[in-house]
Amino acid sequence: MRRWFKKTLPRPPDEEESAGLTNKDIVETNHLYPTITNLSLNSDTSSILFDKNKKPLKPKIIIPDKEFDLDYYLKDETESIQSPFEGFTAQPNFSNFNKQGNTMNREANFQRTNEKIQRNKSIKRVKLFHGNLILDCPIPKKLLVTLPQQTEREFAYMRYSAATCDPQDFSKSLFTLRQPLFFQPRKTEICIAITMYNEDEVLFARTMHSVMKNISHLCTRKNSQVWGKDAWKKVVVCIISDGRTKIHPRTLAYLAAIGVYQDGIAKNQVNDKEVKAHIYEYTTQLSIDPNLKFKGSDRGIVPVQMIFCLKEKNQKKLNSHLWFFQAFCPILKPEVCILLDAGTRPGDQSIYHLWKSFDLNPQVAGACGEIVVMKGKLGSGLINPLVATQNFEYKMSNILDKPVESVFGFISVLPGAFSAYRFEALQNDSQGNGPLASYFKGELQNTGKSGIFEANMYLAEDRILCFELVSKKNEAWILHYVKSAYADTDVPDRIPEFVLQRRRWLNGSFFAAAYAICHYYRFFRTSHTISRKFMLSIEFIYQLATIVFGWFNIGNFFIIFYILTSSLASTSANFLPGEILFRIAIWIYASLLVTCFVLALGNRPHGSPNFYLSMVIMYSILMGYLLFCSGWIAYRAISDAIHNASSTSSSYTSALLNSNVFINIVISLSSTYGMYLVVSIISFDPWHMFTSFVQYIFLSIMYTNVLNVYAFCNTHDVSWGTKGDHFTNNDLGVARLLQKGADVEIAIPTNQSDIDAKYEDAVKLLASPSLEFNSPIINHGEQEDFYKNFRTYVVLTWILSNLFLVGIVLSIPKINGISISNNETSAYLSFLLWSVVAFSVFRFIGCIFYLFIRLCTGE
């Protein structure tokens, strides 16, 4: 039988009480909003409770509940202790029960518990605060009794705010956060944003637990002027989930298990205004590692201030950053903002090293660390050639590309998965122009107001932010690479996911780079020194050359393939099957290229995985033959040079140096790959050369002929792979304004037993084995004709320009072949190979300078 009752609850008269921070004593009560006490935060003491006469109160210790003891979950994996949940532990044990059956039972129990608590919800009359619904909710007692600190209000209560405004109007709508409302407002040094969509609890735990270990490290730096014992009070972690219906249920259970989230509190509407985001604030003292083991203070975990923003609708990652930068950061006013993606695992001291780069150099506006590919236990992931290829690619980018850009002061992209920004540098000017204004301009494409060029450009919006920071008018900001900061991340291990990921990266980076080059003149409006402007000019010439070579990459690769394979067809190569293999290889190459275009224009990678896998395998075989041709030509050139030296009684060295084929092919290729090895050894990170180099060489043709083709053929697709929501749910209920006054009626769970039951069920759900969570199938609507026409223009221009280049080069006999007997090599082939050497030398020198600067600064 339903038990409904109405009771007017007193609401706090000022802003401090709305945050749960007032000068009232703690009173035993069953209300959702009990009278509360002030938190006095001194620099040398922890939070202390005071009575009305400013006298310290004696801490109140709650007696643990014997039926539910979360301390069991705080044990290490090696300790054998029976779980309080009928044999279930926080780590799934597949040997004791059926995976699917028990998980489904847990989910069914979870649903039944929800229904029961829905029936037991009480109708409460609540006074809106400045027209906003703000609730101060007690955490489950079953959680509270396990915490080492129980009396401070930030540990005993979770604060819920129903945001009915857009993020940029958060402060204007009189919403606020806990940090500025303490008796002594807390200063935020670092604010960490973790964005997620539908990542499961393991991926989220990988990031969250690593962040907590980083904060624990900050608390151990006792000799620091900024950090120390209470360093956790200077760090705020913001978790922003993109869509309430998209979040993984087990991730929500994770957040509930550490006290950040409570079910049954949120509402869809407040006073007939649609809720845009549900904001939960809590200072947790627990962490759950990727093995789903609880960790507490005995494992070094310190309290962490957390803000969980659960967006009502799925509005993409850029909108999540809008909430972070425009809603939360203006209130918290952090010195440094760190961006993380759920699933990325920062090193235990990486956040400190990122922050330190800002502390050492006040001109640093943004910084990033090394993105490391997760290779599995004992490097087992490298068995997959696709993972090994990406491992080599990431490593060489972190060894060559990022350091040279850091030396010049402009890094083309700070990866959104792991990067940091100085909040001061992000601010717009008085006219509303600046980095953040440009960064969030991409939000206009959701309303259909942006052009296709801008839409593609904002697929790599982090590149736009980097350019806007360094080119900010009357400022002299620079970007910096921090090698000592690193973060592990998963990479696609299947071709379809890899193709889709690189489509967005390639299109976004191409159009963003074009935008930066076209607006290069803005650097002369900055306050950079003349020497810095000169260095930036050199870097942009390098970037321009990179774009040009990238545009003609598909044509140049075919030219190289044609010249080298046709050279074995000549009699001077002394390779009998050379003519037949040449014709077969060219026909296969052309057929695969046509297939790539057909699939890219009409098929989804997930819909044709076997086609794409077959193409990658065939291209790898062709690459193997190309390597054989290069080796055979080098062998014949060296043999011919030795023979000439013997016949003319000259030295072998002079004979080799007089061989054009040896110099233009052997020396150029050896120089390029030799520099890769040397710079890796100098950087004390050479292992990828031995574990991933061969895989990268064989699959490098895929980057040119598969990824580039798919990317250019899909410039009309400006999606991130997710589709925004355009409907309103009413499943949470509404807070309706009563006729008189500012009171609303809401249905909420108030019985402690119901709150504890919800918490216990969330922990049980987290403890049960995980079933595969299938995301909804995304059904993109038809794109506008304008977008498709733009795609047509881009693809035609790209194909025709490359065909023109191929036709010109291959039609001139003197530059389209190699003759070993006549000591002649293709002039265009020599130009391409030595251009690659020049790019490598440029990056090599930049890397040496970076390592020298790093050594001098002690970074």
Curated annotation (Swiss-Prot):
Transmembrane intervals: 544-564, 615-635, 662-682, 793-813, 833-853
Any single Pfam family the record assigns to this protein: Chitin_synth_1N
Family, similarity comment: Belongs to the chitin synthase family.
GO-annotated biological processes: ascospore wall assembly; chitin biosynthetic process
Domain of life of the organism encoding this protein: Eukaryota
Presence of keyword Transferase: yes
Disordered, as annotated region: 1-22
InterPro entries referenced in this protein's UniProt entry, alphabetically: Chitin_synth (IPR004835), Chitin_synth_fun (IPR004834), Chitin_synth_N (IPR013616), Nucleotide-diphossugar_trans (IPR029044)
Major site of localization recorded for this protein: membrane
Function: Polymerizes chitin, a structural polymer of the cell wall and septum, by transferring the sugar moiety of UDP-GlcNAc to the non-reducing end of the growing chitin polymer.
UniProt protein name: Chitin synthase 1
Entry EC no(s): 2.4.1.16
Entry membrane topology: Multi-pass membrane protein
Magnesium keyword on record: no
